């Protein structure tokens, strides 16, 4: 049996997810070019809320207040927003109604500047080069990456305002953004770590 994942722990690219949630809202049905029906539902657990995209007849059975277990689901970005999907072998099983502790905030499906920057970096890297090694090297000097690094290490007044608007995302984002800076010892021109440049200036 797969261990259950909390909504706060869902990240883009994760697969084989098992998530227990309550349905808060069911969105309207949209039709794809292929004739499939897609419904986006807002769901939550005690750690926050997220959108789930439900395809075809499964969407007709989901009602607000349903407590559902997603099995073999996956997470991906849709228009820069984190979204859960059922996947090919995925399953939604109703296990109850109404009685579940949940929190609507933070909403992990709100547009996250960190995810948008990652998407633009990967698209820019794919346009510049098709290889994975050049992809990593070419994405670091891109303007979106420097904006993220400035919010992490410099004393500029602009980026901290963005961090305060989404405290749940910035706390986790701050950790992930600082890790690549420490793994690039040969990049002294980056603005990522102001402490190192101050130490070398005093010596």
From Swiss-Prot:
Region (Disordered): 110-203
GO molecular function annotations of the record: DNA binding; single-stranded DNA binding
Domain of life: Eukaryota
This protein's record includes keyword DNA damage: yes
Localization, UniProt: Nucleus
Gene3D superfamilies xref list: Nucleic acid-binding proteins
Spans through the membrane: none
Statement: the UniProt record of this protein carries the keyword Transport: no
Gene Ontology cellular-component annotations: nucleus; SOSS complex
Biased composition (Low complexity): 118-140
UniProt KW keywords: DNA damage, DNA repair, DNA-binding, Nucleus
Similarity section: Belongs to the SOSS-B family. SOSS-B1 subfamily.
Protein's UniProt name: SOSS complex subunit B1-A
Organism listed in the record: Xenopus laevis (African clawed frog)
């Amino acid at each position: 049996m797969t261990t259950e994942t909390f909504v706060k722990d869902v990240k883009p690219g994760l697969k084989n997810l098992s998530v227990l949630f309550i349905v808060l809202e069911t969105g309207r049905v949209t039709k794809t070019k292929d004739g499939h029906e897609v419904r986006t539902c807002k769901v939550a657990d005690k750690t926050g809320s997220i959108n789930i995209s439900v395809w075809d007849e499964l969407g007709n059975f989901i009602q607000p207040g349903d407590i559902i277990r997603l099995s073999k689901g996956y997470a991906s970005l849709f228009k820069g927003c984190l979204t859960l999907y059922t996947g090919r072998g995925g399953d939604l099983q109703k296990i109850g109604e109404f009685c579940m502790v949940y929190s609507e905030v933070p909403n992990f499906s709100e547009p996250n500047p960190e995810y948008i920057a990652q998407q633009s970096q990967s698209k820019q890297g794919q346009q510049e080069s098709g290889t994975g090694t050049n992809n990593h090297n070419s994405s670091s000097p891109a303007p979106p990456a420097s904006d993220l690094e400035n919010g992490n290490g410099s004393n500029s007044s602009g980026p901290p305002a963005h961090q305060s608007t989404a405290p749940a995302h910035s706390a986790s984002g701050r950790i992930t953004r600082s890790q690549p800076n420490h793994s690039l010892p040969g990049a002294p021109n980056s603005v990522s770590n102001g402490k190192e440049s101050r130490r070398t200036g005093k010596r």
